[in-house]
Amino acid sequence: ITSTSGDFAPPERAKGLRPIYPGGNDNSGLGLDVEKNGNEISVTCMLPITKSADYKIKVPDNLALEIESGCERASNITVTGMKNEIDIQSCHAIDLKNVTGPLVLSTISGNINVTFTGMPDKPVSINAVSGEIDITIPAKTAASLDLRTVGGAFYSDFDFTEPKNNMKKVVGAELTYSLNGGGPKFTIATVSGNVYIRKGN
C-alpha cells in the first residue's frame, strides 16, 4: 500500500479500545483487513460506509487481480500496467491502462475505459448497464467481437460499416465481427451507453 487518504482514526472516546468489524479486523491501521493464504492475498476495506478513503496499492504486474466494490461505496477503480487476468465487479467507473488481460469487467452506473498494450489469448467480457465503454486495442489485433447494446450505439475506426467522421456507427443492435481473421472472443455489452472501439499502436 503505497499511499492512502482518509479518516482512519477512531473517535477520542474509543481511546484504548480497538474497532470491531463484521467479517474481519483492521490489522493494517488503515481501515483494511489484509490476509495471506498461500499465494493469495486478500485486502478488504473494513471502514463503515459513513467513512471514505482512497488507497493506492502496488502489486507485481503478473498478479491475477480480482476486485469487488459494493454499491454502497462511491469508489472508482483504476488499474495500470497489469499483464495477467483482471476481474472487476463494481457499481462505479472502471479505468484500465496498459493492460493485456484477459478481462472480466462489469459495472452498473459507471463508464469503463480500457487501453490494451497487448492482446490476451483468452476471452474478454466487458459489461456496463448505464455507463459507456471505451476500448483502445492494437490495430493488428486478431479477435472475434460480439457487440451488444439496447439503447446505445457502436463507434469504431476499425472497418465495420459505413464511415461517419472517421468513425463507424451501428445503433441499438447486436454485431458479430471477425477482426484480422478472428481470435479470442470479445463480448462487449451495454444497455443504455455507447461503445467506442479505437485503434491503438
Regions found by a protein language model. Give the residues of each.
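Acidic (Asp/Glu) and glycine-rich low-complexity loops/linkers
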Residues: 1-72, 78-89, 104, 141-149, ...
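Extracellular beta-strand scaffolds
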Residues: 64-65, 72-77, 83-85, 93-95, ...
